[in-house]
Amino acid sequence: MTLLTQSSTWQALSAHSKNVPHMRELFATDAARFNKMSLSACGLLLDYSKNRATAETLDLLFTLASNSQLEAKIKAMFAGEIINTTEKRAVLHTALRSTAEQSIIAEGQDIVPEVQQTLNKMQGFVSSVTSGQWKGYTGKAITDIVSIGIGGSFLGPKIVSQALRPYWNPELKCHFVANVDGTSISEKLKLLDPETTLFIMSSKSFGTQETLTNTLTAREWFLAKGGLQSDVAKHFVAVTSNVAKATDFGIDADNIFPMWDWVGGRYSLWSAIGLPIALLIGMDNFRALLSGAHQMDEHFANAPLTENMPVIMGLLSLWYGNFFNAQSHVVLTYDHYLRGLPAYFQQLDMESNGKSVTLNGTDVDYSTGPVIWGGEGTNGQHAYHQLLHQGTALIPADFIMPLQSHNPIGEHHDQLASNCFGQTQALMQGRTFDEALAELANSALPAAEKQLIAKHKVMPGNKPSNTLLMDKLTPSTLGALIALYEHRTFVQGAIWDINSFDQWGVELGKDLGNDVLTRIGASQDCDALDASSNALINLYRHGKI
């Protein structure tokens, strides 16, 4: 057993998990439960009253957090200590949304001035493009942005841009390319005019395979459509640490934006990686996005554990994963603009906490990161909600909804909200056999069939959920929401004593993929690998099954 699972608090939580009353009973015996188990911060309200939790549960979870030195670990992250120990890096995505008055030291120097300088450079660039001052090679203004990246440099900008669609500049469109599948970029290029298209290439090394391949294809398309190599600088910019490679490609050094080692890819949308967002919504709104995240940073850093929104959410998720064997967690967004958030939170959580050894290399003997999945309401109610209500697996849920819609048409939003709240109520209370049978009382069915149908209509309830509300989806509330989930992820990793900021699981597949690519291009069939890999490679080489 690890020190964590040997601890008296862990053992107490394990025993306590078997004795928590059904949520029906918890609500029936405490009319003030919502008031006691809800919290507002940074423009968000968290209702966590529909959880399998009592005051004793929360006390034990907060004790577990304290005994795991959570507060010290939070301070260490914000102070720029090397908490990504396997890569020997600080973790300072929070510095990207700091104020100009702050001082944050990394590697012996204050990084805030460089962050502010980059924001100011972004401001000038955005102004140049959106005003029409930036011209393409034929003198036309830019109408289309193509953002080329992978992982965090793709998903963050795409999902945030999608979420903030009401704030877009109507003169610009943005297209996101990540997958190395040629179909992805080909379908995008079919829509574009090379004279009015600007490509943003985002890669720390300027050598990420998928991103470089797509960028080279974009340049070939641009040149084939009439552009010259000398025109590349008017249509390509880069976010990278490798200035030399970018300038060799043809990008003007003045149009290269920096990346830093102390920012991980899945936390990078707040940096110049967010340039596509800034172009679409403007720098004032981009700064509001940063401000919302900064407010959540301040809350996370300073609120006591018992009143700390990311801490509470992280602890409750850990509670179900480690003591109720919950293997997945569903995120349900009751706002069409937020439909991409489950995929973003999936990457954030699963790449961060999909680990199986502690910081000192000990194998864990407890579950770590769950599968994160989800979708938008009300679509999911006609699909996977059936599993949530009557399936055998316990799947905690987060419901996210703005109280006000950007598109208040008729009763649409009233119906959306009623479905959201109704789902959380149904998950909590369920339906007993007697209730189901009573609903069939006036049916003409025979008594035996009523009994049978009633059994099929039983829902156990006691299915946990959080509800997150905001007045309206704005850049600020979106920033706070994303930062909330970042810090929630950190809380779990800190208690599990794992490194939430590396991703070695990504590397092996990449390395083997490069080896396979060489074998695909060889002059002879492959016979050097395992039988399955040999067969698959050779089938691909011959182009048919």
UniProtKB/Swiss-Prot annotation:
Please tell me where this protein is predominantly located. Answer: cytoplasm
Q: Which domain of life is it from?
A: Bacteria
**GO cellular component terms attached to this protein's record:** cytosol
Any one GO molecular function term: monosaccharide binding
Q: Which reaction does it catalyse?
A: alpha-D-glucose 6-phosphate = beta-D-fructose 6-phosphate
Q: What is this protein called?
A: Glucose-6-phosphate isomerase
List the active site. E351, H382, K510
Question: What Enzyme Commission number(s) does the record list for this chain?
Answer: 5.3.1.9
Q: Name one GO biological process term.
A: glycolytic process
Q: Which HAMAP family match?
A: G6P_isomerase (MF_00473)
- Protein family (similarity comment): Belongs to the GPI family.
Specify the pathway: Carbohydrate biosynthesis; gluconeogenesis; Carbohydrate degradation; glycolysis; D-glyceraldehyde 3-phosphate and glycerone phosphate from D-glucose: step 2/4
Subcellular location(s): the record lists: Cytoplasm
What gene is this protein translated from? pgi
EC top class, as a word: isomerase
The organism's taxonomy opens as: Bacteria, Pseudomonadati, Pseudomonadota, Gammaproteobacteria, Alteromonadales
Reply yes or no: does the keyword Transcription regulation apply. Answer: no
